[in-house]
Amino acid sequence: MAGTIQNRDSFLDNIAKELGRARKTEGVQRPVWKNNVNLETLKDCSEEELLEVFKKQCENIHTTVIETTKDELKDAIQQMIAENGGGPILVSDDERFEKYGLTSFFREELPSQNVEVNIWDPEEKDENIRFAEKANIGIAFSDYTLAESGTIVVQSRKGQGRSLHFLPTVYFSIIPRETIVPRITQAVRDMNARVEKGEAVASCINFITGPSNSADIEMNLVVGVHGPLKAYYFVV
């Protein structure tokens, strides 16, 4: 990623001075670590094995995993919408909805059934936040999915802001199987590779592990304080 770095030399010189030595400007090599647990964990797992790890972890984070197919995804989502009280619904503006055959479902079918659906509009920041505040359900795709922790990774972009993921009462994440990786290591490595190729980094990257869970010093769990009360992962 191109950019201008200012005051780098003086900054590094000050650090070296505080360390009591001259600044090293050449011959510096990355250390060879004795253990590479970040690279070794789950590295030999197949896609199905990673999915099983993911599902097991989701049991620990109070998240419902629904395995489905592209053809059955719409019906699975519609059923969960009904079971969770219907709209209002806030949906990200993402081209993947078209790929998975969901565009007309959200833009036409649900509204025809008197279910309020709002699509994130990059030109209407304040209105998007109002929609998120009143939404019963927020729906978006996962960009990366971490098997080890049951975490979805979502990046802010024109078609979706942070409030879409945190303000609705219930959150639906659509997870393409190909987004499932062992752990955070692989997700961050891919992001870094994209940046090195010149892609702009997202203004905000959120790692979301199930619904909002908070606990006080007495270990009393409270759900929904900092985000959705319930989370559903649709693995396609």
UniProtKB/Swiss-Prot annotation:
List the Pfam families hit by this protein, alphabetically: LUD_dom
According to the UniProt record, which cysteines are disulfide-bonded? none
Q: Name one GO biological process term.
A: lactate metabolic process
**SUPFAM superfamilies according to UniProt:** NagB/RpiA/CoA transferase-like
Q: Which domain of life, per UniProt?
A: Bacteria
- InterPro entries annotated for this entry? FTHF_cligase-like_sf, LUD_dom, LutC, NagB/RpiA_transferase-like
The protein's job, in short, is: Is involved in L-lactate degradation and allows cells to grow with lactate as the sole carbon source.
Query: Family per UniProt?
Result: Belongs to the LutC/YkgG family.
- Report what the protein is called: Lactate utilization protein C
Tell me which species this is from: Bacillus cytotoxicus (strain DSM 22905 / CIP 110041 / 391-98 / NVH 391-98)
